[in-house]
Amino acid sequence: MAPTKLNLDDPEVKKQALAGLAKTIPVVPFKGVEFFDVGGLLANPEKLQLTFDLFVHAVTPFMDQVDAIGCFDARGFLFAPYLGALFQKRVFMLRKPDKMPSVSDTIEYFKEYKGDSCEGGDHLSIQTYAVSKGDRVLLVDDLLATGGTCEAGIRLVQQAGASVTACIFVVEIGVLNGRGRAIKASTDEKTQIISLLTEKDF
C-alpha cells in the first residue's frame, strides 16, 4: 500500500486523521474489560495505511537510535514488520514460550484478564537471536492499558542485555496509568511512551 501523502506535520490534518482512525476501532466488552479492537483496521485498508503512516511519523525522529523492533503477540505483529522493512531494522516477537522455538529468556507478568494461570498470570518470551547485548529496541503493540504486558516486555529486553528506546501503541487508556508503570520498568530514563490515541478520542 502507498502512503496516504497527508501532511502529518500540520496539527489540524493530524487531528482529523486521528479522529477518522478512532471511528474505525470499535470498543467492545471482552473478558471483563472494555476492549479497543484494532482488528477493525484490517477491514479498512485506507485506515490501516493511515495507522502505518502515523506510526512512521511518530518514530522517524529517533529511528537512528533503534537497532531492533519488538512486537507483542498478536496485534503488535500487524505493525512492526512494516516499520522494520521501511527502516531496515530487525524485527523480533514477544510471545508465550510454547508458541515458538529457541526461547532464550522468559518472564512472568500479570495483565487485565486471566492468562495462563487462574490468578491472571502469563508468560512472555523472546528467541535466542532476538536481541544482542547493547541493542536499542522499539516495542510495538496495539494497546497500553494497565501496562503489565509492556512492563514485561521492557524487563525481558533488559534481561537480554538490551535497552528500550521507545514503546508505541495505537491506543492508550490513560486513566489506567500503564505509561507510568512502563517508564518505571525501564532502566533508561529517556525511554519514550507514544500512543496515537487515548480513550478520550472515542
Model-derived features: where do they sit?
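Conserved G/P- and acidic residue-centered "switch" motifs that form tight phosphate/ATP-binding loops
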Residues: 142, 147
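Active-site-facing substrate-recognition patch
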Residues: 2-65
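Short, glycine/charge-rich flexible loops or terminal/linker lids adjacent to PRPP-binding catalytic cores
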Residues: 89-137
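PRPP-dependent phosphoribosyltransferase catalytic core
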Residues: 2-10, 14, 20-21, 151-202
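Short Gly/Thr/Asp-enriched flexible loops that form oxyanion-binding sites at enzyme active sites
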Residues: 78-87, 153-154
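Short glycine-rich phosphate-binding loop at a beta-alpha junction
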Residues: 64-73
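Structural motif
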Residues: 67-68, 136-138, 166
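A short helix-loop-beta submotif of the ANL/AMP-binding
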Residues: 85-91, 162
